[in-house]
Amino acid sequence: MNMFLKLILTAVLSVIAALPLYSQQLFTGNAESFPPELESIYLKGLDYLQKSQNKTGQFQGQYGNAPGVIGLCVIAMLAHGDDPNSGKFNANIKLGINVILNSANKNNGYIGDSMYNHGFATLALAEAYGAVNDDRIGPALKKAVALIVSSQNRNSKGAWRYGPESQDADTTVSGSILVALFAAANAGIIVPDEAISKALNFYESCLTNDGGFGYSGKDSPNYPRTAIGALVFALAKKKDSGIFKNAITFLSTHSANDTGGQYYHYGLYYAAQAFFHAGTQPWEIWNEINIKTLKASQSENGSWNSSQGPAFTTAAALLSMALNYRYLPIYER
C-alpha cells in the first residue's frame, strides 16, 4: 500500500465511527485556509477553458461540443465564486448555458443525445438557477427533471442508462442523473421522494462484499463507481449508514488509478465530494494530495487531458478542487 493510501486509511479509520458528530460541524474554513497553490492552479485551468470556448459556446477538443461536458465547464466556472452576471467568466457561463438550453428538446426537455449529457447538463442548470440572469433556466430545469422521473418510471431497474427509454441501468449514468436530482431539489424544484428511494435501491443492488459498487450489479467494483455510490448516499443524508462508511473505506484502500488511468479525473470529481462528506480529517488529507498531484500534471496551457478530451478532463480536475471554495449549492453541507 502506498503512502497516499496509508494516510487516507489511517484518517478514515480514526473518524469513521464518529461521522454523525462531524456532520454537524463540517467545513467552516475560509479563503485563508486554502492550500496556497490552489488559486493559481484553479485560475490557470479556468483561463484555459475561457480561451478554448468558441463563440457558439462549445469547447475545443473531443466532446467539447457535448452539452453535458459544457455543463461541467460551466459548473467549474460557477464554483470559483465570481459573479456569474458581471464577473470575469460571465460571458463564458452565459454562452455555455445558452448551448444547454438550445440543446434541450422543446417537447420533453431531453438535453443532448444521452442521459449522461442530460444528467450533467441538468446539474449545470440547477447550479445556475437563481444565480444566472436567464428566465429560461427555471422552465428548462423543470422539464429536465420531469424527463428524468418519467424515464425512471419506465425503467425496470428504477434507475437510468444511456437513453430515456432504456430498460437496464448502471451506476455511472445513474450517478450523473441522481446528483442532478439532488441539486434540482436544493434549487427548489419538486423531486419525488420515490425517485430518490428507487435509485438508492438500485445502488444497493450493486453493492459488493468489499464495500464497493459494481457497474450494473455486484460486478467489477472500482474507484469511480464506488465514489459515485458513496456520494449519492451522502447526498441522501445517509452518511451514518454502513453503506457509506464501507464505501469510504474502499476508496481509502484503492487507487484512483485502478481503472488504468482512463477514468482517473472522472473518479476524482466524485471522490472529492465523497471524502468531503466523510469528515474534516479524511478530506483535508485527500484534498492536499489531490491538489499537489493535479499541480504536477497540469499542462502549461492550464488544461488536463485524457481520452475524454481536454474540456471534460479539465472541468473534472477543477471540480475535484472546487470544494475548497464551497460556493455551489450542491457543496453546502
Task: Please annotate each region the language model reported.
Residues 24-44, 58-92, 105-146, 150-197, ...:
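An alpha-helical repeat/solenoid feature that recognizes helix-turn-helix modules
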Residues 1-9:
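Bacterial N-terminal signal peptides that target proteins for export
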Residues 8-20:
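Bacterial N-terminal signal peptides
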